[in-house]
């Protein structure tokens, strides 16, 4: 009796295992691809990966192999496994360089690094890699509809790097190293034009001039800065410093 029970259990396990396996098997590459895409749309990341991977195993010579490879990258992004996503997208570029998915794959490599980029108080390796990948995308595919998005990402990432330098400039000023603060701030303005950090650096330069008793120069800089599109926090600091400088000038 025990033997029959064990045999029955084994058979049941095999059956359920087979059913689970068959759940992610399809009869054609088209059916695989359609199911994989639906899984992605529904946010079912792991099933999508299984479907695309099984498709590549079952139909390695299919006209949809590059689509499946791209799908693997998307599934990894869906799971927020960005290093895996980078690997899958790079594999597509290496094995299917003329695939219609190649431009988007290159963009998504940059996006995967972007999603890993950390704040200014941590290592910026992923930030630099994301800038490199988005820049390469813009150079390789200048007519892509995603160029605008890539440039926006580049600006945001450069701003992150610059904000770290702004923090250093503020610290130099706080510690009394006026010349170092000025040099840091001027380098930010030159290297990262058009960023929030560049505007913050201009404010640092105005503060340096106040410290150096160049009140009129500071007021001129603050007046120009006030005409820019500033974030509320920076705008408040500019107004407060402007009022202080004006009062100090009136005392002379």
Give residue spans per PLM region.
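Repetitive helical segments and hydrophobic/amphipathic motifs
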Residues: 11-12
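Acidic, polar-rich low-complexity tracts and alpha-helical solenoid repeat scaffolds
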Residues: 2, 6, 17-252
């Amino acid at each position: 009796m025990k033997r029959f029970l064990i045999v029955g259990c084994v058979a049941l396990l095999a059956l359920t295992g087979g059913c689970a396996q068959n759940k992610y098997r399809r009869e054609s590459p088209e059916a695989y691809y359609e199911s994989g895409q639906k899984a992605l749309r529904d946010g079912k990341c792991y099933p999508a990966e299984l479907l695309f991977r099984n498709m590549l195993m079952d139909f390695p010579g299919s006209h949809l192999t590059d689509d499946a490879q791209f799908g693997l990258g998307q599934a990894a992004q869906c799971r927020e496994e960005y290093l895996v996503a980078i690997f899958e997208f790079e594999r597509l570029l290496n094995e299917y360089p003329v695939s219609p998915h190649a431009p988007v794959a290159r963009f998504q490599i940059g996006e995967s690094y972007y999603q890993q980029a950390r704040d200014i108080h941590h290592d910026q390796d992923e930030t630099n890699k994301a800038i490199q990948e988005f820049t390469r995308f813009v150079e390789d595919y200048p007519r892509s509809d995603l160029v605008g998005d890539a440039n926006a990402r580049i600006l945001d990432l450069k701003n992150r790097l610059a904000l770290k330098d702004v923090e250093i400039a503020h610290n130099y000023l706080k510690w009394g190293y006026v010349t170092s603060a000025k040099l840091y701030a001027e380098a930010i303005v030159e290297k990262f034009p058009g960023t929030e950090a560049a505007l913050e650096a201009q404010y640092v330069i105005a503060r340096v001039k106040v410290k150096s008793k160049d009140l009129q120069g500071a007021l001129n800089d603050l007046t120009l800065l006030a005409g820019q599109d500033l974030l509320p926090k920076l705008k408040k600091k500019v107004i407060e410093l402007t009022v202080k400088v004006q009062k100090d000038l009136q005392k002379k």
